[in-house]
């Protein structure tokens, strides 16, 4: 039970990190178009 929760938490953190890293790039692309 706790292992599943830990796995979901880890995936969620990875997704959030990805959004944080991709955010500026998306903003730049949006301004460029």
Swiss-Prot record:
Protein name (record): Cecropin-B
Swiss-Prot/TrEMBL GO biological process terms: antibacterial humoral response; defense response to fungus; defense response to Gram-positive bacterium; innate immune response; killing of cells of another organism
Tissues with expression: Hemolymph.
Modified residues (5-hydroxylysine): 21
Organism encoding this protein: Heliothis virescens (Tobacco budworm moth)
Function recorded in the entry: Cecropins have lytic and antibacterial activity against several Gram-positive and Gram-negative bacteria. Also has activity against fungi.
Keywords per UniProt: Antibiotic, Antimicrobial, Fungicide, Hydroxylation, Immunity, Innate immunity, Secreted
Subunit structure: Monomer.
Source species, domain of life: Eukaryota
Localization per Swiss-Prot or TrEMBL: Secreted
GO cellular component, one term: extracellular region
Family to which this protein belongs: Belongs to the cecropin family.
Cited PROSITE patterns: CECROPIN
Induction: By bacterial infection.
């Amino acid at each position: 039970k706790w292992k599943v929760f830990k796995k979901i938490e880890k995936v969620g953190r990875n997704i959030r990190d990805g959004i944080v890293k991709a955010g500026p790039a998306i903003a730049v692309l949006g301004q460029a178009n």
